[in-house]
């Protein structure tokens, strides 16, 4: 089995500067940084466009290590031939180390962005840096899956295949209330709109991070753990919160509040596989996942039950044949 250190050695990390980027609201930023990683070699058609591109998209945690796609790449029975495809991972708009409130130091003055902006950010980068004819496949998880679904209906001819895990087409009522509450708690801090980063904002991140990430604890752990074990999980969230910026967190949370694409998914042309983890507490399979069968024309929806520990993606081995058949 290839280790995570081996795969990180295979990945090449770099940055690219977009001369400018225009948001949907008309605001423009100049000298916009895009952090990205690649693996493999691109293949080109007669027009010089890349034909073997596979895009891996981040989860809410926004790191490749936390993305379930790494298990596909790390698997000794790798479902893709590494020699045949060119893999690209792009840190999204709004997330360090790409253009974000914290990286630009714009904080609350950073332009309000949408999932459509995040799609255009990645698409502009790919067109400028790695001009492609069509993306062979996008593999995405959680918030990265939301973004990829938006991409699929905005630019339906851009991709052939789409695989999304732990996604929904609209934020369910209880999750909407949580996201809205986080927004209101942050905005209630009188220092949020100050030009100087106040210490009270740093202290605020700890309870907010617990509230925002509690849904990342799988059902098998949350429902069957005693309070001491749950306190251990929360301690881990405390450690993570020390490295999170409240403005970055605020803007990503805003995306969730406004997410509802139910009436747009009929425009998706990509052959789509939706994987619903029934052990994920944030999603209800019948409410959030199953409707994709009717919402996306060429789609397959499968339930999986992935028992796992905190910060583990679980064992996908029994589903590898499904993925292989779908992606190849």
Language-model features: locations:
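N-terminal cap/lid subdomain of alpha/beta-hydrolase-fold enzymes
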Residues: 37-102
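Flexible "cap/lid" loop of the alpha/beta hydrolase fold
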Residues: 163-192
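Catalytic active-site module of serine/aspartate enzymes centered on a nucleophile-bearing elbow/loop
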Residues: 297-328
